[in-house]
């Protein structure tokens, strides 16, 4: 039986500036929280997100999706989980869940591709990052094993 992927949990307190006229969090803020959780996940794997650029690569977002179930409001304390849902040689997909206590408010995903910063071309997972990203994936999804 495959092991579940590593998850990060990031706590977010909803700021007033993140809400709209209806008093709920504006939909675009969920993507910002996804980025916070994704960055935290990378840190848990043993590297900081900025190291990708230092190595001469970019991890470009090619797709994003958020499914909203309930609205978050100013002052709510939320937990945003992130995990690596798919790892392929040139692309990866992160999945997310936003909760207030036990209540799931939103789920989502972002898809990314590796790009060589010097050429702007698609490339395979950079060698120095294969091990850290493989640690995030469940064994059945690791193309490098």
What are the residue ranges of the model-derived segments?
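Terminal targeting signals and extreme-terminal segments of soluble enzymes
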Residues: 1-79, 85-145
């Amino acid at each position: 039986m495959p092991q579940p992927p590593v998850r990060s949990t990031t706590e977010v307190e909803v700021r007033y500036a993140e809400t709209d006229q209806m008093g709920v969090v504006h939909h675009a803020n969920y993507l910002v929280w996804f980025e916070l959780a994704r960055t935290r996940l990378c840190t848990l794997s043993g590297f900081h997100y900025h190291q990708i650029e230092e190595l001469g690569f970019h991890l470009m977002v090619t797709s994003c999706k958020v499914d909203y179930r309930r609205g978050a409001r100013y002052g709510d304390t939320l937990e945003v989980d992130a995990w690596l849902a798919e790892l392929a040689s040139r692309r990866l997909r992160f999945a997310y869940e936003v909760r207030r206590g036990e209540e799931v408010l939103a789920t989502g995903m972002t898809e990314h591709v590796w790009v060589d910063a010097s050429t702007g071309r698609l490339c395979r997972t950079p060698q120095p990052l294969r091990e850290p990203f493989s640690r995030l994936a469940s064994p059945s999804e690791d193309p490098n094993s």
